Amino acid sequence: MTEMTGSRLRGSLTALVTPFRDGAFDEAAFRKFVRWQIEQGSHGLVPTGTTGESPTLTHSEHDRVVEACIDEAGGRVPVVAGAGSNSTAEAVERAQHAERAGADAVLVVTPYYNKPTQAGLYAHFKAVNDAVGIPIIIYNIPPRSVIDMSVETMARLFELKNIAGVKDATAKIDRVSQQRQAMGDSFIQLSGEDATALGYNAHGGHGCISVVANVAPRLCADLQEATLAGDYAKALTLQDRLFPLQTGLFAEANPAPVKYALSRLGHMTDELRLPLVPVTEPTKRIVDDALRHAGLLVD
């Protein structure tokens, strides 16, 4: 990893949704959304992750979403392409495609469902490391993958050339300090939990791969900039403004509430792919109230 690339993977990186229309990837809406994200101050973009409904994208759709994001971003902000799979061979293929397309880095989730041991996790990420020449961000998300990568395994992986950091969705705030003490400040630590992102940075984190930033990119960027500058009074004010979104957008399975919010703001339809379905009326009311609280929706 070059020092320049590492220094750019900071702040608010949006875990982008993938818009659909009539069952197909809506590339026009996606490109417009990418432009808006950059205009609103997002520090980076992360397509084809969990929020981007990657499990229900075909391989060709997955690749096209990554290509469109990189093309539209045009180097203005870094693009960290989701490239995870519980098949090591597929993770390698997606990571290699992302590198060919011009991604700045890839985000690789810990393999889900098949529950590898720590030795298996190491072998999986080493295989991806050996197959590409761009930075790799480990995505550690035990609530979805069932397994939890240990700090010791992560430290071993950091010795490899391309392992650059972690998206930490463990919800264990003490992990930030443990990982920082084990690997040093050059190991990029990005929160995967919007509601705890302020505290995450206080422990030495470098930013957040944010779901809420889909809806409130400027506010999320301002929050991250305040924490990284040590202005926690300003950060707390922004946190209070964002907090109802940080909870309301997870009232049902992500990204259903996010897509509803974006449909209310006029960015795209709320269309999802099965087995995800549109949110219920009670959740719509929760999201609407959160949008109003943040000053994003005026009736």
From Swiss-Prot:
Subcellular location per the Swiss-Prot or TrEMBL entry: Cytoplasm
Keywords assigned by UniProt, alphabetized: Amino-acid biosynthesis, Cytoplasm, Diaminopimelate biosynthesis, Lyase, Lysine biosynthesis, Schiff base
GO cellular component: cytosol
InterPro entries from the UniProt entry: Aldolase_TIM, DapA, DapA-like, Schiff_base-form_aldolases_AS, Schiff_base-form_aldolases_CS
EC number(s) reported in the record: 4.3.3.7
Positions with a binding annotation for pyruvate: 51, 209
Catalyses which reaction(s): L-aspartate 4-semialdehyde + pyruvate = (2S,4S)-4-hydroxy-2,3,4,5-tetrahydrodipicolinate + H2O + H(+)
Pfam family, any one: DHDPS
Domain of life the protein comes from: Bacteria
Subunit (UniProt): Homotetramer; dimer of dimers.
Protein name: 4-hydroxy-tetrahydrodipicolinate synthase
Species of origin: Methylobacterium radiotolerans (strain ATCC 27329 / DSM 1819 / JCM 2831 / NBRC 15690 / NCIMB 10815 / 0-1)
Encoding gene (name): dapA
